[in-house]
């Protein structure tokens, strides 16, 4: 179930501030836009991103990974390049890469896990090579419960010249995730794993990477100008957010992050440890 604060906040939006964002000149639209963009800022602060412009709202983490795979992957992956995953990945972090690999004629490789159910670092090292253009891994596995050594993995990847995408769905509500400290390049998160509503997620990447990525969806809001011959794109983050966004859901996610911050991640970890020891 969801925290009462989250439900109340969504209800308040629909009762008092219900309007589309970035489109209207009237007061309700201005209020909704402010609340929506404050939600983006709250995610930026939560993951310690460089700028709120780096936060792309999506329907879920699956869509976030698909945007990275299709927009960045199709543009940057060449024939015989490699994408390195682990065998513990969620299907959402496998299938998008398989699709782009088939289209761009590159390969998807999988690092093994040990008998203890953790990432086999030696196998990972063996499969990381000059053809590996991106490493995409889960932070905490939703099936095995293990926490991957992301800083060690990122260092290996960076030394190899590879980018790193982190599926942080399971970790964001349980441990601190600092994108700068982890030195990653992409992060995918989902609202419903953060005590927030369904139908909202986000993709983070550094501004210099996002600037070079083409938009995946076309329509309202993501354009700057539309001509008969061509169109030009809006600035970040809006060039990746076509159409009316999930406004209430974004505002609800922002309230959920406030709820987690009030509880404190250290207190959450302590309580989870006590539960584990009790079991």
Label the model's feature ranges:
Residues 1-279:
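Pyridoxal 5′-phosphate
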